[in-house]
Amino acid sequence: MEKIGMFWGSNTGNQEEAAGFLKDFMESEGVEMDEYNIADTDPSKMLEYKRLIIGCPTWHIGELQDDWDFIYGKYKELDFSGITAAFFGCGDQVGYADNFLDAIGLLGKPFMENGGTLIGRWPTEEYDYDNSLAEDGDEFLGLGLDNDNEEELTEERLIIWAELIKDEFGV
């Protein structure tokens, strides 16, 4: 079985911690993964994998995390044809209700526009926010985590989502 490549960026450590938990859980389930901090990785490295997990928190007012922002131009030019990816991100649905999880949308939409298949959608119903670029009907384009207001739900959400994407990846 081919490995899954996980690429993430983090300023405060929340996204890094979630990525580490997710990797540990997936590997405990027999899924082989490689993990990359996007701060130290050329985005073209993603093209070496057929399956990706991409993690990015929403930063400031609806912006990408610093390292993702730095490579975003190059990311948007990649051809993701034949690649399947799941997205997850941290946000604050109370303090930033008008742009909750926007980073998932900022990364997920160009991924699909450039030929990629997006999996791992997550229902919006458990969240209280006003607007999100990650929203697609009654789903987000990926898993939303809110350690600022619902930290007690983070591990449970990660486990449920990991089981979902394992099935969707076919692993």
Residue ranges and their predicted role:
Residues I4-M6, Y36-A39, I71-K74:
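Short acidic/polar alpha-helix capping motifs at helix-coil junctions
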Residues F25, E29, E48-V171:
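FMN-binding flavodoxin-like domain, especially the glycine-rich phosphate-binding loop
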Residues G30-D42:
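A short beta-strand-loop structural module common to alpha/beta enzyme folds
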Residues G9-G13, D40, T58:
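Short, surface-exposed acidic/glycine-rich loop or hinge patches that mediate macromolecular interfaces
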Residues M1:
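Iron-sulfur (Fe-S) cluster-binding modules
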Residues I4-F25:
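N-terminal beta1-alpha1 ligand-phosphate binding loop
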